[in-house]
Amino acid sequence: MNNTAKLALGAVAVVVAALLGITFLVPGGPSIGGPGPSNEASLAPEPTPTALRASVGEGRLEPGTYVSHPLASNPLLAVTFTVPDGWYAFDDSTLVPLGEGFEGPDGAVLAFLEISDVYSDPCESLGDPDVDAGATAEDLADAFSAQPAYEASVTDLTLDGYSGKQVEFQLPSEFDASCPRDEYFVFGGGPYPQGPDNRWHLTILDVDGSRLVIFTHDFAGTPASRQADLESMIASIEIEIEIED
């Protein structure tokens, strides 16, 4: 393993990885064995049929409108967004571009996350996160900006009528090889950096008592078309609290 940290995508991603012949890293698990999914037909499942508000699910996505339910604490919170051509879903809340994958120097990711706590030292992340991040968008943004291990700039924003914070991270260009497992966790459960100079963009929203984190990452080498895809998906987002049956 080199000292470049890898992305934790959860147990569902491991299942998808088995289908693709790729090994993904989850906390405490083995390292990634290769890049993200490619456009090779032999490596990707059949495209998911386009449907209005189809669940994101897993596999290669046809362009269209999809819905994700990313919060375990509030499963009725629904995020609807439009996916352009050339994207693959690892699970209900994590998308990567076909071809580039998620690693540097040209990868990208869109994910919907639930973050409760952060690490004061991302290099010492074997235990639970040690900094409480409160319950609001401002609380989490303040927790990030207070940590000296990385640079995080915070601005106010509104998305689909919900107010929150935009946090831009510039992560270290190199990670200390003495980090346990060569990993660098900013918050519990991943994701974590995919290569030197990985750029993170977090949109943190207060949504009717819940906190939703919309996470994207890219690199200087990420194609402009993929960066435009990320921007268009975020711009298309509509958030609602569904009525329980």
Task: Describe the residue ranges of each PLM region.
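A broad, low-specificity signal for short, low-complexity segments enriched in glycine/proline
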Residues: 47-49, 124-131, 172-177
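Second-shell loop/turn segments in exported
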Residues: 127-131, 154-156, 217-224
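Surface-exposed beta-strand edges and their flanking turn/coil or helix-capping segments
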Residues: 125-127, 165, 179-184, 226-231
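N-terminal targeting sequences that direct proteins away from the cytosol to non-cytosolic compartments
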Residues: 2-111, 115-116, 120-123, 192-197, ...
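Cys/His-rich zinc-coordinating "finger/knuckle" motifs
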Residues: 94, 130, 186
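Signature of long, low-cysteine stretches enriched in small and polar/charged residues
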Residues: 137-203
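Structured domain cores in non-transmembrane regions
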Residues: 119, 123-140, 147-149
